């Protein structure tokens, strides 16, 4: 069975790129969200195996969304995909419960490597 993924980013182009990378890698993208509030709602509704999460988004940022999702499911698997790659931001994301952090702009292989590593 394919692993089910929720893609969260406020940029439609970035969601499309990540979805394309994941589909080519054999993953099933079951949903997407453009902000943290919708990400939490979609997570509850879809219960995906993995979430890719941006940090800087309207309504609710990605780190807050990670914390909210981890309240719903402490075992939630979340990979951050963000241009906010400063060390402090990466540490905040990991402490919030993210399993890995991919810095934009990224190579498709780096996204697949991160997803594969955390989903096993």
Language-model segments: residues:
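Acidic catalytic/metal-coordinating carboxylates
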Residues: 35-38, 61-64
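Active-site beta3 strand of CheY-like receiver
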Residues: 46-52
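C-terminal output helix
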Residues: 106-115
């Amino acid at each position: 069975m394919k692993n089910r993924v929720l893609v969260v980013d406020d940029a439609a182009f970035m969601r499309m790129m990540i979805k394309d990378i994941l589909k080519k890698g054999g993953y099933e993208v079951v949903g997407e969200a453009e902000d943290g509030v919708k990400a939490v709602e979609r997570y509850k509704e879809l219960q995906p195996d993995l979430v890719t999460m941006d940090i800087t988004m309207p309504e609710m940022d990605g780190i807050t969304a990670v914390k909210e999702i981890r309240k719903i499911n402490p075992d939630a698997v979340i990979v951050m995909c963000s241009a906010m790659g400063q060390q402090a931001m990466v540490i905040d994301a990991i402490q919030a419960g993210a399993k890995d952090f991919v810095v934009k702009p990224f190579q498709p292989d780096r996204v697949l490597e991160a997803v594969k590593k955390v989903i096993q």
